[in-house]
Structures are given as structure tokens and as C-alpha cells.
Design a protein with these regions (language model features):
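Nucleotide-sugar donor-binding/catalytic module of glycosyltransferases
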Residues: 1-163
């Protein structure tokens, strides 16, 4: 059983999927599985998923004949996940190469039940914009309820998993 399941919903992602997959292949932490859910893509995304899976036994691909949306794709991934922990990655995003290792080690050292991190936007002009709704730190249940519920949920009842 892998330590971490990474679920990637894929739809019409041919132009940028290679960067996402490369970021997984180059992770310094190796005890992961990658679940690619091709959600009815009509571009070359499905073939890229299959090619990547053929090279790495940790990768599983699920193809849907028609698009059902990102939530259903993630739910399919959740149903298939075998990891002790689960994370999501969008097909047009990528991880830093040490991301999973860093999160895993911090979680192991602290005994935490979950780990989270910020993100960096790569802007069209090549600049980067770091974003984080969560201050760095290790939190107990009470602190999570007090400090993190607002940033995680925001002022809305529904907040994107990642945006």
C-alpha cells in the first residue's frame, strides 16, 4: 500500500499535462501512487496518461467516455485510492520535486493527521506569485478549528479544493 495517493483529474490537458506528470516522476519521495482520471478528453490527454502509466507501475489510469466534471473525477480517484494519505493535483499544475517528501517528513515528525502547503502561481510574464492562506506551522485540533477554518472555508460555503 502506498503512503500517498495523488489524484489528478484530467480533461483536455494535452498542452500542459507533461509538466504535471514530470513533477510526479521527479519526486524525491517515492512511496506514492498516481491516479489519473481522464474525464472524457478528446485531445491527446488520454494517450499521454497511458504512456506515462506504461513507464511507471505506480500510475493507474481510469478513462471515462464522456466528461462528468472535476468533482466526479476526484470522487472516482478517491474510490480507487490505496494510499494512507490522499492529495489532489490538477493537470495544469505541478509539485516542486521535494513537495511530497517535505510534507511526509513534517507529518511524520509531528505525528499530525494531515499536512498542507501554500502554492506559487506562475504568471504569463514568467514571474512567480507565492500564495498561502495558511500560516506555516504545526497545529493541534483546537488551533485548526480556530485559525484554519476561516482560511480553508473562507466566507463561502463552498471553496475550491485548489485554485
Amino acid at each position: 500500500m502506498p503512503s500517498i495517493s495523488v489524484i489528478v483529474p484530467v480533461y483536455q490537458a494535452e498542452k500542459f499535462l507533461h509538466r504535471c506528470l514530470d513533477s510526479m516522476a521527479r519526486q524525491t519521495f517515492s512511496d506514492w501512487e498516481l491516479i489519473l482520471v481522464d474525464d472524457g478528453s478528446t485531445d491527446g490527454s488520454a494517450a499521454l496518461c497511458d504512456q506515462f502509466a506504461a513507464k511507471d507501475g505506480r500510475v493507474r489510469v481510469f478513462h471515462r467516455k464522456k466528461n462528468h466534471g472535476v468533482s466526479e473525477a476526484r470522487n472516482l480517484g478517491l474510490n480507487e485510492a490505496k494510499g494512507d494519505f490522499i492529495t489532489f493535483l490538477d493537470a495544469d499544475d505541478c509539485y516542486e520535486f521535494q513537495a511530497l517528501e517535505t510534507l511526509w517528513n513534517l507529518r511524520e515528525q509531528s505525528g499530525a493527521d494531515a499536512a498542507a502547503c501554500g502554492l506559487t502561481y506562475l504568471l504569463p510574464d514568467g514571474k512567480q506569485s507565492a500564495q498561502s492562506q495558511l500560516p506555516a506551522g504545526i497545529y493541534g485540533e483546537k488551533e485548526i478549528r480556530e485559525k484554519l477554518t476561516g482560511p480553508l472555508v473562507g466566507d463561502r460555503l463552498t471553496q475550491p479544493v485548489f485554485n
